[in-house]
Amino acid sequence: MLHLYNTLSRQKERFQPIQPGKVNMYVCGMTVYDYCHLGHARVMVVFDMVARWLRASGYDLTYVRNITDIDDKIIRRAAENGEPINVLTQRFIDAMDEDAAALGVQKPNFEPRATQFVPDMISMIEELIGKGRAYAAPNGDVYYAVREFAGYGQLSGKSLDDLRAGERVDVDPNKRDPMDFVLWKAAKPGEPAWPSPWGQGRPGWHIECSAMNEHYFGPHFDIHGGGADLQFPHHENEIAQSEGAHDCKFVNYWMHNGFIRVDNEKMSKSLGNFFTIREVLEKYDAEVVRFFILRAHYRSPLNYSDAHLEDARSALSRLYTALKNVPAADVALDWEANDYARRFRAAMDDDFNTVEAVAVLFELAGEANKSRSAELAGWLKTLGGVLGLLQRDPVDFLQGGSLEGEISADEVEQLIAARKAARAGKDWAESDRIRDELIARGIVLEDGAGGTTWRRA
């Protein structure tokens, strides 16, 4: 029975979907004005893991992850580049899709773009005004009146006065309260705009998600997820909008993944430690990056460093080595089939504890190596597949395409051939020199009756 940590209640809760057997999940996606970074990679991989587990558990899942394709940053970047906004956003949507596919992230059922749902946003704003929870300002903006929603602060666990004291709020004469937030922005020269009852303008960021998830799921659904940085104000404001418009509970379970740090410092462009997914994939295999993310609990901070990625590569190589040594038999996924399957399920049902689930994979690999059991190797591959891992040909992974600074497969084969010739000529010193050179360059040789095989360390 699945239990998950609910940010709203600040405790683990037994998961009970609104409709038995069916789950609706919405995750806040990317604002597409630049290439995706490591923080985006974690959101993608974490909620892909959640989606895979819900489906493996037998749920009929509908997964929606939105795309923000209108935003101040997008408008600014398009102006800097001198290109149309839709050209800029499509380029980065395509790049995002490439990054996600490389990381083994399955596409959500729906990926709505904010610009496709502006009429829905206008309708929700009208509902909020009609209930006295929003107001049109003289300048053409529309604001949410936070004092008119009694539940404001429930997700962050702070009262409105506490939030106001702790936030740096710009004084805006158009607002009734400094904590009021914008629902509709009046048009500015040169910016995209849509007609509305309040004049030409565009939606605020927060209303976009409320309108899109209502379009797919109605006013009440099961799981809403995103990065921890979205808990306040974005998700707090979503609750205010959706519950303020419909006077019913919005979301049953809120999930937030932890931050990524780089060498124990916050990732930021100003510190020069900001990495895009593409930059990381130039150095490391994409499955290694996915494995690195899943080795940590999704709510824990994740520290990125070259040492940690190298450790992840070495660990994943051990699992693939077990599959290379013992060909995997086909096994049907039955959670009561053996103790490994039961413990894997128990780990994942405990708030998606991939740390313990991966530990089960290592136990399986060790036992499969020891017993030479094709069935256990089959379970290793099958359970790994639930996490989106271990589905490649083991030799292909272990010999992998060379990454930045690595020796190529062709060069390895040439050196192995030279070593073979040296051994045939009983030139043991040259044979040892070649082996030592390969070891120094991260290549492990394994001599057997069928010849010499190799893998990356």
Swiss-Prot record:
Monomer. Its EC number is 6.1.1.16. Zn(2+) binds at C28, C209, H234, E238. SMART domains: DALR_2. A motif ('KMSKS' region) lies at residues 266-270. It catalyses: tRNA(Cys) + L-cysteine + ATP = L-cysteinyl-tRNA(Cys) + AMP + diphosphate. CDD domains: Anticodon_Ia_Cys, CysRS_core. Binds 1 zinc ion per subunit. Its main location: cytoplasm. PANTHER family: CYSTEINE--TRNA LIGASE, CYTOPLASMIC, CYSTEINYL-TRNA SYNTHETASE. It comes from Laribacter hongkongensis (strain HLHK9). Keywords: Aminoacyl-tRNA synthetase, ATP-binding, Cytoplasm, Ligase, Metal-binding, Nucleotide-binding, Protein biosynthesis, Zinc. InterPro entries: Cys-tRNA-ligase (IPR015803), Cys-tRNA-synt_Ia_DALR (IPR015273), Cys-tRNA/MSH_ligase (IPR024909), CysS_C (IPR056411), Rossmann-like_a/b/a_fold (IPR014729), tRNA-synt_1_cat_dom (IPR032678), tRNAsynth_Ia_anticodon-bd (IPR009080). A motif ('HIGH' region) lies at residues 30-40. Its cofactor is Zn(2+). It comes from the Bacteria. It is found in: Cytoplasm. This is Cysteine--tRNA ligase. Belongs to the class-I aminoacyl-tRNA synthetase family. One of its GO terms (biological process) is cysteinyl-tRNA aminoacylation. ATP binds at K269. One of its GO terms (molecular function) is zinc ion binding. GO terms for cellular component: cytosol.
